[in-house]
Amino acid sequence: MSFSDNLAKILDKYENLGKKLSSGIMGDEFVKASKEYAELEDVVAKIKEYNKAKSELEEANNFKLEVGLDNATLEMIEDEIHTLENSLPKLERAVKIALLPKDDADSKSAIIEVRAGSGGEEAALFAAVLFNMYQRYAELKGWRFEILAISDTGIGGYKEASASIKGKDVFSKLKFESGVHRVQRVPETESQGRIHTSAATVAVLPEAEEVDIKIEDKDLRIDTYRASGAGGQHVNTTDSAVRITHIPTGITVALQDEKSQHKNKAKALKILRARIYEEERRKKEQERADSRRGQVGSGDRSERIRTYNFPQGRVSDHRINLTLYKIDEVVKNGQLDEFVEALIADDEAKKLSEI
């Protein structure tokens, strides 16, 4: 089937769904048709814009062939033809992007987990910097940032930290942040002024609802214990800390941030559900597209994706060869959009090349 035939088929389907919805159908049939109709709205709008430009180009070319046109009119028509010819490839690309298979998780909120990697205390300090950077970014985007757990070192660093970020299409924007982030800077404790390299790992998971992942009580092992502070001392006289293990997958989440065992359990279940959902997504993605494993967005957490070089004031994303010399704006102010948009565009381009 040609590209044009495929577009015509989509327009026919959209029109038929509209007629069906107007015919008075009810119940599950109405719900199903409404969902399909809504899912097609965006691509149909882009198809109509593309078809309109094609039609206008054809009309302009035909008009240009008419006898007796003065020079001013001919120049005006040629300008219009030039504009339309330039716009058509962009409109066609927009249609193709709209036709790409959607990741069901893209529209979801996200859970972000940051863990200190190699580099000791400096790595923990960098993990805290990254976590705060994502909090600033969430604020800029108008998303709700809820801290789930922080395991601190007592001097400003984070061994690990997690948060729930709620908003529209959060996961689609943040999913490319998963991986190893490397920092190069002179630690405050370094008397010789030598640059140290350390790293932190970021994992971004789509926040799963109960409808996405059903967790049976029989599949959970829940252990409670007393919360401990940064030095290992017990900071609570009750067993408020919770460790939940999902027996079928072996995935474990431990939480002790809240004084209430009930609150710790609720937060731990939220993280557990997200991890199980992400594991299932990974398996399906691997089965569906093994050939795309090496692409941006493969989510390989062992992959070094970005370097933050403070002496040079630069942030470099190694997947797309993009370097920005504004480290303070990125790290302190959370201005990540240039990286986010470039990564999304790169991912779309690679997917389009497979069509």
Swiss-Prot record:
Compartments reported by the entry: Cytoplasm
The family this protein is said to belong to: Belongs to the prokaryotic/mitochondrial release factor family.
UniProt name for this protein: Peptide chain release factor 1
Disulfide cysteine pairs (residue numbers): none
Keyword hit for Metal-binding: no
Alphabetically ordered keywords of this record: Cytoplasm, Methylation, Protein biosynthesis
PROSITE patterns hit by this protein: RF_PROK_I
Its job: Peptide chain release factor 1 directs the termination of translation in response to the peptide chain termination codons UAG and UAA.
Keyword check for Nucleus: no
GO cellular component, one term: cytoplasm
Post-translation changes: Methylated by PrmC. Methylation increases the termination efficiency of RF1.
Residue numbers carrying N5-methylglutamine: Q233
Domain of life: Bacteria
